[in-house]
């Protein structure tokens, strides 16, 4: 076996002929049936004569008179003439002289005699032989041509003659040629025609079955063995020994072609040349001598005869390069009969087979020089969805004419038995191949033998339809079977027998047939002009005729036009057939695959023209049509072809002119690029000697193996290797590949939309989604829960639809359907089909095939509904009714501004989590049906609502108000929008409700209000606010609304929550003063429905009605980056601890309920975090006891005392994060401030990130009630006197130093943390004193466990939850919270929920200065994604990430030096998918934009993020221990706190309550001096935030800080150490990466090319990062941009680029995306060249007093604090002109430098940072900016640059569509 390596020009070279074992052909052929009547061979006709019977002339001796026609009429040549004589034709047979080769008729009065012809001038009796009578002036004569004396043995001679009278219904007999001239030209009588038959006039021949003489290569290829029957096809009439007269000429070689069809319908093409060679008389047996007539009767031999035999050389290939093969074989034949030669013939054969490359799009033409005089050209096969064919339509039309060609089409489409015959074997193959091509899209399903050997002719007896081509000499031996329609290509006649005679082209539908005939007639005339050459009679000239290249091209074009005409016809008669296909939409029955089930046949027939029902009935009953319907309905290798046909049908449908082109040549055909291949090299001898001419042949030799020149390794067979993919082009389409029609259609759409700004941005978006779906198989593959991943993709589809991308790419639906089939999800496949129909897309054949395959072959869920399900239904109804009642009771307390639309559609969950975990198909699928409706408007990873301003632009109306800063009352559509979205979920969702309480419902409701776009009006719950002292981050409307309501009535916390939504967190201290819970409810049910958790594995999306999803969207505003929190919450980070729980109980909790986090009360009571634990302790013990008795009791029974607590819980849930409750958050600390105690709302200075990520983390359900700990009589100040992370802890540094180096696999924290948690927690519950001791004892251990990995216990807890793949628990992120929350103290709760919901932790996210937005949504499945998508505290966050990636697309134009931002780059791209450039919006020049990527390696010894087990990469913890592991304490070391966010140095005593209250602004951690020095010496740079707008708020400027050095591509504040104190433990960060930023159109093309060349697995391995960085980083950017989950970020972890310095084997490293934090930046400080800093950085420097930027103030006095504040004030007043003027005025003072930054960006970015991103309506800003720009005075205009111009519509549309990256 030889290994296959891509397509080959030729597979085998074969020599066939007479072998020693050949048997006589007559022994081999046995036709036992009656069809094959043996015909008697007839001698050739040597003479023809005319006799006039009316004058008494008689038939001469040995002549035969033709008295009657074939049907018995008189054969008088003047038939019916009144006055003409009766003239008859006579002929004589014999071998005494050369036979006649042609007959003709001469009209003497208007024609001349052709050369070589003779006239029969007189009768045998001397009278004139004028057929029209001697009296007529118009004389007509019979003419003939005779063969030469030394004629070749295969000369065709006339063997039969007849007369026909067509007017009497006669036609030429089979194989007879009609002379198309009427012999009777009198006024009376019928037209009379002469017909004759020609055959080979051979004598003395013995035929044998041909055998294989030799072959090359000797070994078979893996995918294609040499068929045994090849010699039979090489010599179809057998190998013969012939006896010739000695003066006979050698016949020229005959070229023939044949096609072999394998069992899999794969075609192999053969090209052969037959020739004769002398045969030694000595080798003849006596019998052979007798048969050949060499021995006379008296025993003497005849010496005047010579003996010859025929031989054939042949090439076999999968590609029909017939013309090239003909030239090569002819060259070999000539080489064998000439010589001597330097090189052996074997060298030429192996050179052609191995050294000639296969033509490809890159090298469409290969010119092969065979010798100085011989060459050939190989052209790339036309890359078309049409089946590959060796036929030529021009040959068919030229030989048969339009009418017979169309009649042949009718025979084929109605499945007749078709026998095509000719004496020219190459023409035979050409015509039959063209015939099976012209019936496309049907594929001939029956026997098909284009050139049938005589030995296989019994196929003609087959009882089924067939298409067989046969040599016409067959009819010299046999009569044709009676039920076969015979087509004689040589004479252009079709003979039908019996009832088949009525089947002709006229039964076809009239209009399509008329169009077809017109086109064919026109092309037939063109062919006649083009082909003025004599008809090829099967013989070849020795000189290779290179006919004019242009003529060849023209012939090829005519060929395509003929094919297109037939294609147009087929598309016309089948128009609209797809609408009659019936998809399988339910569990398939036994008859599901019957054609009757798959196709509405009767409806189809009724839709056709009634007058042609006969034809349609015949066609639809054929096997071919039924097969066609099956192929359309299921996956087959014909899918690409069928999709192409559907495209043709659409074109025919639309086309009115008839000028549409259905077949378009691809560009490579037009290319002139040609590769030249030289002849084999002649060996060079020393001293310049001539090589000897040692090879000469006296016939074609038997090939010698040792003379072949084989390529290296050619014979090394690969054993045990599966046959590789065949080189045949008919393999099914790979999953990712679009059809050519889809690619062309996408190009057209892109071209059309590129000039329409609104549509261009959507076009780019459409391509981005398409890219994600192409990568979807790789993503699903790594997801633990395939079902969730698929549902995520389904949600993305729905989201695409909501974005009104017209139309979405069909490949997206197709890939998802394929995956549904692959992973057994038929119900989802049905939904995808319905979504497709909803989007207005008719699935093409490929998509439809994969759909039916998915629903047919997958296992459908059982239909029986369990008792559990039915009882759950009853329970839900009861609960639903109750909740409605309670909601009504409390309705009076709800603010009028609340929206009632969202309450009923929150998707209550009726599935237990156990069921979800099990993936119970029955319930799951039942649920799916309901869930489907609920999640219509959301999809995944909150991405719908996360896209800055215009994610759902097409769907939602924009703000009408032109107010830049969003205020109350400006929104007309926000409420409507929300209700519109939420109401898509119908009331039936009530039937799957969970144990939700009314409060919970309201809680959700309040969060629901927040789901809308940041660029949309933010007015749901906001009242207008006075901007006075309001901190820039506070959502003013919320606060004011809160205060106004308090005036009218005493609002309950629930009301406040309703009002505040996400902004509630900022006001936590205000509320906590006034309320405190009566009881701590811990039995709250989970908020999440199954629908919520559907996608947890594969996405971060909680589906639309998950409250936290709503909140997360809006919570951006206040919650994400609360910098003060960072300082204040350090203590808490130390303290989180977790209760022990019975794993079994936890499991039950999973399935039944989850607990609300506890209230955090008066901060002042106990500053030690543990002091906050006390109140929960008793409640916890009590609850645990109850739970041990009966879990469900506490679940289902709402507590009577719970109302107020519920309100608070609800309120706090909306704001807090798990980690924060462990510390008095800055909000709460500020509550201790006197001003805050006066409840002066504007004073709440929650320093929040102003430029927020599009999807902020979801708020965790953690309450922070200030008064909470007051329930404890004794403050527990001393309880946590020595926390592990206490800055004063003497062991800290030592412990880190000693333990960090311990083996990563054997680490204290991995051993101790869960057990310590258990121990500690149980001790806490035992009593206060014990708890105090436990705290001290535990803190010492935590010091070791956490510090050894630098907070690895925190990482452990976080990653354990994240890593705990959601497949195992089927929980959403919140579910994990709940399952951990149980009866636990608030501290424990916060810790555990924090572990899970990193996303919500304020410590983590809000304060995470480094967080550029919710973390990468690329996380791998489930929790892992959630975890990765969001961040724990700044300190904690990087404990859960191995890698942080910062990407900016901001680029600099090379021409004008202006900074071009993301949306401007997008707007400048073109529709050309080969153009990498964009157009600069400022100077109009093109340039190549770049993505700048910086990677921070956060790994260190002990936390390398290795794969946990080979089997389940994502399941880091077995479920049995997961609950405890996940609950490990989230403790944050000082170094941890300092990592990446803020190394804060403040001097104050942690234990001093009063001092703390005074210093609430900067609670920071003291760093031991020596540690500090080390850290600082190693890292002179201040640890920087990843976002310039989130730098830490520090009271004092640290004078010891050194000046910042810009090291990266990001703003200065984005650089620096992520862990200044722990820097020595980090691996070096990988080098920055810069790659071209490509349009999605270009990326798609590149990705397809990559997948095609390297396979689907290419994007699942880390080498993708290293080998294809451009495609990789662009994909990462786009997926992150749209918040789509992906496996790609995980590949960074094990890539070569990121592991240059790592000693750990890459295959051991985790590739889980949850460990990679990806942040997208709008700006790129590295590119800034202006001397000053951007205004938004200066704003932070001035207003936030960031030490890191204080130095900027000294060098940058132009823009002082007052100036910036006045600008911001102007912007609040909708005045952009003022700031513009101020900036221009300031800049004019130093006119010497060339300004690079634009006014637009300066003012916009300042607005976003100063006023909060969520408060700025950028659309309104753009309007105001344009108006202000138009107002500029001429002198001001002179100071502006091009980059100051307002953004164009295209730029604005791209920003709206894709949202804004982060500052």
Swiss-Prot record:
Motif (Bipartite nuclear localization signal): 917-933
SMART domains: dDENN (SM00801), DENN (SM00799), uDENN (SM00800)
InterPro entries, alphabetized: cDENN_dom, dDENN_dom, DENN_C, DENN_Domain_GEFs, MABP, Pentatricopeptide_rpt, TPR-like_helical_dom_sf, Tripartite_DENN
Molecular function in Gene Ontology: DNA binding; guanyl-nucleotide exchange factor activity
Tissues where the protein occurs: Expressed ubiquitously. Highest expression in bone marrow, medium in peripheral blood lymphocytes and lowest in spleen. In brain, breast, and prostate, higher expression was seen in normal cells than in tumor cells. Expression is regulated in a growth- and cell cycle-dependent manner.
Alphabetized Gene3D superfamilies for the sequence: 2.100.10.50, 3.40.50.11500, Tetratricopeptide repeat domain
GO cellular component labels: cytoplasmic vesicle; cytosol; nucleus
Boundaries of every dDENN domain copy: 523-641
Location in the cell: Nucleus
Biased composition (Polar residues): 1297-1306, 1348-1371
Ranges for domain uDENN: 192-364
PPR repeat residues: 772-808, 809-843
Record's protein name: C-myc promoter-binding protein
